[in-house]
Curated annotation (Swiss-Prot):
The gene is Mefv. SUPFAM superfamilies: B-box zinc-binding domain, DEATH domain. Zn(2+) binds at residues 442, 445, 465, 471. It comes from Rattus norvegicus. Residues 1-92 form the Pyrin domain. A zinc finger (B box-type) spans 442-479. This is Pyrin. Residues 122-135 have a biased composition (Acidic residues). It comes from the Eukaryota. InterPro entries: DAPIN, DEATH-like_dom_sf, TRIM/RBCC, Znf_B-box. Degraded along with the delivery of its substrates to autolysosomal compartments (at protein level).
Length: 747
């Protein structure tokens, strides 16, 4: 019967190892899909086995796109060999050839299967119509006995509990029906003729065993090792039977005994199926209700005859050669047994072997209990592979071992039939097979994966780097463990930075409002100071220019503070984005510059973002105080100066004996602190001093006329001179002193 795309897709998923299947699920959840296709929920994909995963792919994406998506994910996860095999198997040319060759056989087999189902299991058609998922998988994956039937099966199983226990304790107990955990399908004679030249594919375990045999023989001709690859649909524990060439006759005889038991099991299954005992056993609840076991009479007879004829021919030829006087070669016997097993089992034949395969298959109770026990256990353990849990769709059946302990040995029935030497060799091979090839390799040591992380150097290292002198005494941990710790640190820093960002956003509006108030106050003070200065007969023009310059620099300082604030906020956003991107990076990229990134995050504080330079507030406060003081003093000075300097002809006589006091005038002049440098704050005292002539301690009497001359002409002349001198009094002569930083204006 020709395989369909669904079969090839399921076989490909079953070929994946556990960690490869998890990687496939993760890539399936993260890869981009075409338009019109929805993503499968993660909760369904997470715990799905190959069968359920195939059903989900077909349900959500259809047969064609499911195959294309599987090919895309396999290539993305470096499973190129499986991708090529699936591509060749599902190509249009291959499918056309298979459909042309096995179309008639498949149709006849399906009709016969339907006839057996209709006669043996009444009501199964209705169950298949109610189940929407049964149409997705091939007919060999159809499920029977759902719903209330499971409860009745469980009850009947509980009732038969003591009987099953008694059958397990009896050494010669035999099973009631040959129920296995796999579905048995054979090829028709047409398939045999069309595919006579096809050779069964060797599994990965066989290739590794052949390679190890060739290496141990030191360049001699490697013997071809063959195995029975038992495909599994429902349970991940699938067994393989590697047959190696032995040099001892007892072990070869054990292989023949095991082979004969398997042949008896196949014939017993055929007879039980023809007599209708399979359906009866399923109804009693001993077998597995998930899978129907149907065997066509013609195909079963062909398979049995094929096995018997092949065994007779090869065994007769082998024993005849040894009986003619030639030496008895164990290699020939091993090759004969291997050929018998592999020739009798094609890739389409699925044998169901339980945990107690070595028991006599003629015992119905024993086989039934083994099948039920195998069904109840969801996890299987292989002593040769040393793997437990949900294995991929291929494992191994141990037939022989290079040590003295063999699986057929009755002394080793209560323990694992494998020696410590085989365990160590197989453990090394499994580690090599499961080593991740996508991890970055060490730049110093080729073909060494960086699986460790040095805490002192903050960098990933390999095992050889760990043993080097450079990392002696350093704290070294697995990179996964270190990545978890650093991810936790990144998460904490992200939470802190996000809280800081929220705090900054909350205080952003008040800060802007304060800046606007500062600018308004500055502009108001500028206007209030500019008006009195203009009214004081323009003798404060230079003072006004200096003051305006100082205010402009103050405005620029406030603007720089605002720019600094926005710059810090942008840096905070950039740092948050870098940390978010760093958190999603793979482990080996995450650990490259983790120290510098965390240091930047730890040094970022909210005070840097919201902190206003302390000099700005002090300058504004000082400006406010000094401006008010200058306004009052200038007003007083203007009024007093106007009253004191208003010279007229009527006031000359009355003010004849009164001279203006320099100390009094000096007290009326304000002291103003100015900022002349934009980068540094410099306080200057503006002092109006009288210009002293050489040798005099008091200013000359410029403003008062002589009392000796009191004519109107002279009075007019003195009045003009006084006005001229008063104008010269209003002229500024600024001088800057670097020692005391005082600005003095003299006249």
């Amino acid at each position: 019967m020709a395989n369909t795309r669904v079969d090839h897709l399921l076989n490909t998923l079953e070929e994946l190892l556990p960690y490869e299947l998890e990687k496939f699920k993760f890539k399936l959840h993260t890869t981009s899909l075409e338009k019109g296709h929805s993503r499968i929920p993660l909760s369904l994909v997470k715990m799905a086995r190959p069968i359920k995963l195939t059903r989900l792919l077909l349900t959500y994406y259809g047969e064609e796109y499911a195959v294309r998506l599987t090919l895309q994910i396999l290539r993305a996860t470096n499973q190129r060999q499986l991708a090529e095999e699936l591509h060749k198997a599902t190509g249009p040319e291959h499918l056309t050839e298979e459909n042309g060759v096995g179309g008639s056989v498949q149709s006849s087999a399906e009709n016969k299967d339907k006839g057996v189902k209709g006669s043996d299991v009444p009501g199964e058609d209705e169950a298949q119509q109610n189940d929407d998922e049964s149409d997705i998988l091939p007919p060999i994956q159809a499920e029977v006995g759902k719903g209330p039937q499971k409860k009745s099966l469980a009850k009947r199983k509980d009732q038969r509990g003591p009987e099953s226990l008694d059958s397990q304790t009896k050494p010669g107990a035999r099973s009631a029906a040959p129920l296995y955990r796999r579905t048995l399908v054979t090829q028709s004679p047409g398939d045999k003729e069309n595919r006579a030249g096809a050779q069964p594919q060797e599994c990965q375990l066989c290739r590794e065993a052949a390679r190890s045999t060739a290496m141990s023989q030191g360049g001699e001709r490697s013997r071809r090792l063959k195995c029975i690859c038992l495909q599994e649909r429902s349970d991940p524990g699938v067994l393989k039977l590697p047959l190696t060439q032995k040099k001892e006759n007892p072990q070869i005889q054990k292989l023949f005994r095991l082979k004969r038991k398997q042949e008896m099991a196949v014939s017993f299954v055929r007879e039980a199926t023809l007599n209708g005992r399979t359906t009866g056993t399923l109804e009693k609840g001993v077998g597995i209700p998930e899978h129907s076991m149907m065997l066509d009479e013609e195909t079963s007879r062909n398979m049995s005859s094929k096995i018997s004829l092949t065994r007779e021919k090869r065994c007769t030829a082998s024993w005849t050669e040894n009986g003619n006087g030639g030496p008895e070669t164990p290699e020939t016997l091993g090759e004969t047994v291997s050929s018998i097993l592999c020739d009798s089992c094609s890739p389409k034949v699925l044998l169901s072997l339980g945990e107690k395969l070595a028991q006599t298959p003629e015992d119905p109770a024993s086989l039934g209990q083994a099948a039920s026990k195998g069904r109840s256990r969801d996890k299987v353990a292989c002593p040769l592979c040393h793997t437990q849990g949900e294995l991929p769709a291929k494992a191994c059946v141990q037939s022989s071992c290079s040590c003295s302990v063999a699986p057929g040995d009755p002394k080793a029935s209560g323990r694992h039939s494998i020696c410590f030497q085989c365990q160590s060799s197989r453990a090394g091979k499994s580690c090599e097979a499961q080593s991740p090839q996508f991890l970055p390799q060490c730049p110093r040591h080729m073909k060494q994966v960086q699986l460790l992380f040095c805490e002192d150097h903050r960098e990933p290292i390999c095992l050889i780097c760990r043993l080097s002198q450079e990392h002696q005494g350093h704290r070294v941990r697995p990179i996964e463990e270190a990545a978890l710790q650093y991810k936790e640190q990144i998460r904490k820093q992200l939470e802190r930075l996000r809280e800081m960002r929220g705090y900054v956003e909350e205080h952003k509006l008040p800060a802007d409002k304060k800046a606007e108030d500062f600018l308004k106050q500055t502009e108001t003070q500028k206007q209030r100071i500019s008006c009195p200065l203009e009214k004081l007969f323009q003798f404060l023009e230079q003072q006004e220019q200096l003051f305006v310059t100082w205010l402009q620099e103050l405005v620029q300082t406030i603007g720089k503070v605002r720019e600094t604030y926005y710059t810090q906020v942008s840096l905070l956003d950039k740092l948050i984005g870098e940390l978010e991107a760093k958190q999603d990076q793979p482990e080996w990229e995450l650990m490259q510059d983790i120290g510098a990134t965390l240091h930047r995050a730890e040094t970022m504080t909210a005070s840097e973002l919201l902190g206003i330079p302390p000099g700005v507030k002090e300058k504004l406060h000082l400006l406010y105080q000094k401006s008010k003081s200058a306004e009052k003093n200038m007003q007083r000075f203007s009024e007093m100066l106007g009253s004191e300097m208003a010279f007229s002809a009527s006031d000359v006589a009355t003010r004849e004996g009164c001279r203006p006091s320099t100390t009094k005038a000096q007290a009326l002049i304000p002291t103003v602190h100015l900022k002349c440098d934009g980068a540094h704050t410099q306080d200057f005292d503006v002092i109006l001093c009288a210009e002293l002539e050489a040798g005099g301690s008091e200013p000359q009497d410029y403003l008062h006329p002589s009392s000796a001359q009191d004519t109107p002409e002279l009075h007019e002349i003195h009045s003009q001179n006084n006005k001229r001198k008063f104008k010269s009094f209003l002229k500024w002569k600024p001088s800057f002193s670097r020692t005391d930083r005082c600005l003095r204006t003299c006249w």
